[in-house]
Amino acid sequence: MTEKELLKIDNISVNYGNIKALRGVSMNVNEGEIVALIGANGAGKSTLLKAIVGQEPLVEGSITYDGEMLFEVKDKHYHGAPTYNVVKKGIALVPEGRRVFADLTVEENLDMGAFMLKDEALIKRKKEEMFDFFPILGQRKKQKSRSLSGGEQQMLAVARAMMSSPRLLLLDEPGLGLAPLIVQEIFSKIKLINEEDKVTVFVVEQNARLALKSSNDGYVMENGVIVLHDEAKALLKNQKVRAAYLGE
Protein backbone atom coordinates (compact mmCIF):
# COMPACT_ATOMS: atom_id res chain seq x y z
CA MET A 1 0.00 0.00 0.00
CA THR A 2 1.37 3.40 -1.01
CA GLU A 3 1.80 5.85 1.85
CA LYS A 4 -0.17 9.05 1.47
CA GLU A 5 1.31 12.22 2.90
CA LEU A 6 -1.41 13.95 4.93
CA LEU A 7 0.64 16.70 6.60
CA LYS A 8 3.82 18.21 5.16
CA ILE A 9 5.88 20.72 7.11
CA ASP A 10 8.52 22.27 4.87
CA ASN A 11 11.41 24.28 6.32
CA ILE A 12 9.30 26.33 8.75
CA SER A 13 10.65 28.86 11.22
CA VAL A 14 8.80 30.67 14.01
CA ASN A 15 10.11 33.55 16.12
CA TYR A 16 9.08 34.86 19.53
CA GLY A 17 10.44 38.39 19.27
CA ASN A 18 14.19 37.94 18.86
CA ILE A 19 14.06 34.29 19.93
CA LYS A 20 14.02 31.64 17.19
CA ALA A 21 11.53 29.08 18.54
CA LEU A 22 11.60 26.90 15.41
CA ARG A 23 14.41 26.85 12.87
CA GLY A 24 14.00 25.22 9.48
CA VAL A 25 11.74 22.40 10.65
CA SER A 26 10.68 19.84 8.03
CA MET A 27 8.64 16.69 8.66
CA ASN A 28 5.85 14.56 7.22
CA VAL A 29 2.87 12.78 8.75
CA ASN A 30 1.48 9.98 6.59
CA GLU A 31 -2.21 9.18 6.61
CA GLY A 32 -3.19 6.41 9.01
CA GLU A 33 -0.07 6.64 11.16
CA ILE A 34 0.71 7.73 14.69
CA VAL A 35 3.73 10.04 14.67
CA ALA A 36 5.50 11.09 17.87
CA LEU A 37 7.58 14.21 18.46
CA ILE A 38 9.78 14.00 21.54
CA GLY A 39 12.22 16.44 23.10
CA ALA A 40 13.06 18.29 26.28
CA ASN A 41 10.80 20.91 27.79
CA GLY A 42 11.20 24.17 25.86
CA ALA A 43 12.50 22.47 22.69
CA GLY A 44 9.74 24.03 20.55
CA LYS A 45 7.35 21.08 20.32
CA SER A 46 4.22 22.95 21.40
CA THR A 47 5.14 25.87 19.15
CA LEU A 48 5.13 23.48 16.19
CA LEU A 49 1.59 22.30 16.97
CA LYS A 50 0.43 25.90 17.32
CA ALA A 51 1.97 26.71 13.95
CA ILE A 52 0.11 23.81 12.33
CA VAL A 53 -3.27 25.22 13.44
CA GLY A 54 -2.35 28.84 12.73
CA GLN A 55 -1.91 30.04 16.31
CA GLU A 56 1.72 30.99 15.65
CA PRO A 57 2.65 32.69 12.34
CA LEU A 58 5.53 31.40 10.26
CA VAL A 59 8.47 33.59 9.30
CA GLU A 60 9.71 31.01 6.80
CA GLY A 61 8.48 27.87 5.05
CA SER A 62 5.09 26.28 4.47
CA ILE A 63 2.58 23.80 5.89
CA THR A 64 0.52 21.64 3.52
CA TYR A 65 -2.45 19.46 4.52
CA ASP A 66 -3.89 16.81 2.22
CA GLY A 67 -2.18 18.44 -0.75
CA GLU A 68 -3.58 21.90 0.03
CA MET A 69 -1.51 24.83 1.28
CA LEU A 70 -2.53 25.82 4.81
CA PHE A 71 0.14 28.37 5.68
CA GLU A 72 3.14 29.75 3.85
CA VAL A 73 5.60 32.61 3.76
CA LYS A 74 5.79 34.05 0.26
CA ASP A 75 7.76 37.16 -0.66
CA LYS A 76 8.38 37.63 3.10
CA HIS A 77 4.62 37.76 3.82
CA TYR A 78 2.70 35.20 5.89
CA HIS A 79 -0.41 33.74 4.26
CA GLY A 80 -2.80 31.37 5.97
CA ALA A 81 -6.31 30.22 6.76
CA PRO A 82 -8.11 31.27 9.97
CA THR A 83 -8.11 28.65 12.73
CA TYR A 84 -11.80 27.75 12.30
CA ASN A 85 -11.03 26.80 8.68
CA VAL A 86 -8.29 24.49 9.92
CA VAL A 87 -10.88 22.67 12.04
CA LYS A 88 -13.26 22.60 9.08
CA LYS A 89 -10.57 20.93 6.98
CA GLY A 90 -10.33 18.09 9.49
CA ILE A 91 -7.58 19.02 11.97
CA ALA A 92 -8.24 19.05 15.73
CA LEU A 93 -5.84 20.06 18.52
CA VAL A 94 -5.92 18.82 22.11
CA PRO A 95 -3.88 21.55 23.82
CA GLU A 96 -1.36 21.16 26.60
CA GLY A 97 -2.94 21.32 30.04
CA ARG A 98 -6.30 20.01 28.75
CA ARG A 99 -8.04 23.40 28.93
CA VAL A 100 -11.56 22.12 29.38
CA PHE A 101 -14.29 24.66 30.11
CA ALA A 102 -14.32 24.33 33.89
CA ASP A 103 -17.77 25.84 34.51
CA LEU A 104 -19.49 23.83 31.79
CA THR A 105 -20.69 20.27 32.22
CA VAL A 106 -19.02 17.36 30.48
CA GLU A 107 -21.85 17.27 27.94
CA GLU A 108 -21.64 21.03 27.34
CA ASN A 109 -17.89 20.70 26.70
CA LEU A 110 -18.65 18.14 24.01
CA ASP A 111 -21.20 20.53 22.50
CA MET A 112 -18.42 23.14 22.26
CA GLY A 113 -16.34 20.64 20.29
CA ALA A 114 -19.22 20.23 17.83
CA PHE A 115 -19.48 23.94 16.99
CA MET A 116 -18.92 23.24 13.28
CA LEU A 117 -21.80 20.75 13.12
CA LYS A 118 -25.36 21.89 12.37
CA ASP A 119 -27.19 18.55 12.46
CA GLU A 120 -28.58 18.05 15.99
CA ALA A 121 -29.09 14.33 15.42
CA LEU A 122 -25.45 13.99 14.36
CA ILE A 123 -24.26 15.92 17.42
CA LYS A 124 -26.32 13.66 19.68
CA ARG A 125 -24.93 10.56 17.99
CA LYS A 126 -21.35 11.83 18.29
CA LYS A 127 -21.83 12.49 22.00
CA GLU A 128 -23.16 8.98 22.54
CA GLU A 129 -20.14 7.60 20.67
CA MET A 130 -17.84 9.53 23.01
CA PHE A 131 -19.72 8.31 26.08
CA ASP A 132 -19.37 4.73 24.80
CA PHE A 133 -15.66 5.25 24.13
CA PHE A 134 -15.01 6.98 27.48
CA PRO A 135 -17.62 5.39 29.82
CA ILE A 136 -16.54 7.53 32.78
CA LEU A 137 -17.57 10.65 30.83
CA GLY A 138 -21.02 9.18 30.30
CA GLN A 139 -21.32 8.64 34.04
CA ARG A 140 -20.27 12.24 34.68
CA LYS A 141 -21.97 13.98 31.75
CA LYS A 142 -24.03 16.34 33.93
CA GLN A 143 -21.11 17.25 36.22
CA LYS A 144 -19.10 20.44 35.87
CA SER A 145 -15.77 19.57 34.29
CA ARG A 146 -13.89 21.27 37.15
CA SER A 147 -15.00 18.33 39.34
CA LEU A 148 -13.24 15.75 37.16
CA SER A 149 -9.86 14.24 37.94
CA GLY A 150 -6.89 15.16 35.76
CA GLY A 151 -7.19 11.93 33.79
CA GLU A 152 -10.92 12.43 33.26
CA GLN A 153 -10.31 16.00 32.08
CA GLN A 154 -7.75 14.70 29.57
CA MET A 155 -10.29 12.16 28.30
CA LEU A 156 -12.81 14.98 27.97
CA ALA A 157 -10.32 17.11 26.04
CA VAL A 158 -9.73 14.24 23.59
CA ALA A 159 -13.46 13.53 23.29
CA ARG A 160 -14.18 17.22 22.66
CA ALA A 161 -11.63 17.24 19.82
CA MET A 162 -13.14 14.07 18.35
CA MET A 163 -16.58 15.71 18.16
CA SER A 164 -15.47 17.44 14.95
CA SER A 165 -14.68 14.06 13.30
CA PRO A 166 -11.07 15.00 12.50
CA ARG A 167 -8.83 13.19 10.03
CA LEU A 168 -5.76 14.50 11.87
CA LEU A 169 -5.64 14.67 15.67
CA LEU A 170 -2.88 16.75 17.27
CA LEU A 171 -2.12 16.05 20.93
CA ASP A 172 0.10 18.29 23.05
CA GLU A 173 1.51 16.46 26.09
CA PRO A 174 -1.55 14.24 26.78
CA GLY A 175 0.28 12.59 29.69
CA LEU A 176 1.34 15.81 31.42
CA GLY A 177 0.82 15.71 35.19
CA LEU A 178 -1.00 12.37 35.18
CA ALA A 179 -0.22 9.17 37.08
CA PRO A 180 1.60 6.51 35.00
CA LEU A 181 -1.37 4.13 34.87
CA ILE A 182 -3.65 6.94 33.68
CA VAL A 183 -1.11 7.94 31.02
CA GLN A 184 -1.06 4.35 29.75
CA GLU A 185 -4.87 4.36 29.60
CA ILE A 186 -4.87 7.62 27.63
CA PHE A 187 -2.36 6.23 25.13
CA SER A 188 -4.34 3.01 24.73
CA LYS A 189 -7.35 5.17 23.80
CA ILE A 190 -5.20 7.14 21.34
CA LYS A 191 -4.19 3.88 19.63
CA LEU A 192 -7.85 2.81 19.41
CA ILE A 193 -8.78 6.16 17.85
CA ASN A 194 -6.09 5.56 15.25
CA GLU A 195 -6.92 1.91 14.58
CA GLU A 196 -10.72 1.90 14.82
CA ASP A 197 -11.67 5.43 13.74
CA LYS A 198 -8.84 5.62 11.16
CA VAL A 199 -7.69 8.98 12.54
CA THR A 200 -4.10 10.02 11.86
CA VAL A 201 -2.38 11.14 15.07
CA PHE A 202 0.53 13.50 15.70
CA VAL A 203 1.47 13.47 19.38
CA VAL A 204 3.94 15.64 21.29
CA GLU A 205 4.96 13.95 24.53
CA GLN A 206 7.76 14.10 27.11
CA ASN A 207 7.17 10.45 28.05
CA ALA A 208 9.38 9.37 25.17
CA ARG A 209 9.22 5.64 25.80
CA LEU A 210 5.43 5.42 25.80
CA ALA A 211 5.05 7.85 22.91
CA LEU A 212 7.47 5.91 20.70
CA LYS A 213 6.03 2.52 21.69
CA SER A 214 2.61 3.78 20.58
CA SER A 215 3.81 5.26 17.27
CA ASN A 216 4.84 4.25 13.77
CA ASP A 217 7.26 7.10 13.20
CA GLY A 218 9.21 9.45 15.45
CA TYR A 219 11.06 12.76 15.45
CA VAL A 220 13.38 14.29 18.05
CA MET A 221 13.51 18.06 18.50
CA GLU A 222 16.23 20.05 20.26
CA ASN A 223 16.30 23.85 20.49
CA GLY A 224 13.75 24.30 17.71
CA VAL A 225 15.50 21.94 15.28
CA ILE A 226 14.66 18.36 14.22
CA VAL A 227 17.82 16.39 15.03
CA LEU A 228 16.60 12.82 14.49
CA HIS A 229 13.92 11.07 12.44
CA ASP A 230 13.32 7.34 12.10
CA GLU A 231 10.77 4.61 12.62
CA ALA A 232 9.64 4.75 16.24
CA LYS A 233 10.94 1.25 16.99
CA ALA A 234 14.38 2.27 15.69
CA LEU A 235 14.44 5.40 17.86
CA LEU A 236 13.70 3.23 20.90
CA LYS A 237 16.96 1.40 20.18
CA ASN A 238 18.98 4.52 19.33
CA GLN A 239 21.72 5.02 21.92
CA LYS A 240 21.47 8.82 21.90
CA VAL A 241 17.71 8.67 22.42
CA ARG A 242 18.06 6.04 25.15
CA ALA A 243 20.62 8.16 27.00
CA ALA A 244 18.88 11.53 26.61
CA TYR A 245 15.18 10.63 26.83
CA LEU A 246 14.76 7.09 28.18
CA GLY A 247 16.98 7.46 31.23
CA GLU A 248 19.35 4.66 30.22
Residue ranges and their predicted role:
Residues 2-248:
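Glycine-rich phosphate-binding loops of nucleotide-dependent enzymes
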